[in-house]
Amino acid sequence: MADKMFAGLSFEQVVERYNQTVVSVCVMRLKNWADAEDCFQNTFVSLYSKKPELMSETHLKACLIRVAINECNNYIKKNKRIVSLENRKDEAVEFPLDETDISWALLELPDKYRQVLYLHYVCQYKVEEIAEILEKNPNTIKTTLKRGRDKLKSIYGGDLCER
């Protein structure tokens, strides 16, 4: 590929460094490996088609997460009217990553909780950073975190998400 630079990294280095993060976001959002692969590829195609800007690695990671979420949302909207004969809950989702118990538990939650809890506990973003990525008020993120933790506790019990 051409010598475009993103936050001082070549495109290949960006893909290598952030592929697991983008795959995880896509799988968490879509709950289907094949669909997640499509959105994963579209995320990096979208990044490459943009003009490289001077940005920090942190900003680049946040940008990739936001683009991945948008790609997944667009995919869901596009395929919303297609009736699936498969029951997606019965479909096995395989991750090429070493996922923690919390990552698997998040798959049981509705999207609005899953995204916020994933970004907070797995990606270790602060509330303010999540608010910026998802373009929401920090207080909304705090409320969503609390409600998501409560839902996890009701499903699994105990101190699964105490931090």
State where each predicted segment sits.
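Conserved RNAP core-binding helix
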Residues: 15, 23, 33-49, 63
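A short pre-motif secondary-structure segment
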Residues: 116-120
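Short, Lys/Arg-enriched C-terminal cap helix and immediately downstream tail that follows
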Residues: 77, 109, 149-163
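Sigma70-family region 2
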Residues: 3-4, 31, 42-59, 78-80
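A short, charge-rich alpha-helical start-of-domain segment used by transcription regulators
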Residues: 1-24, 28, 37
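Arg/Lys-rich amphipathic alpha helix in sigma70-family domain 2
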Residues: 55, 66-85, 147
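Internal acidic/polar
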Residues: 74, 81-107, 126
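DNA-recognition helix of helix-turn-helix
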Residues: 69, 134-158
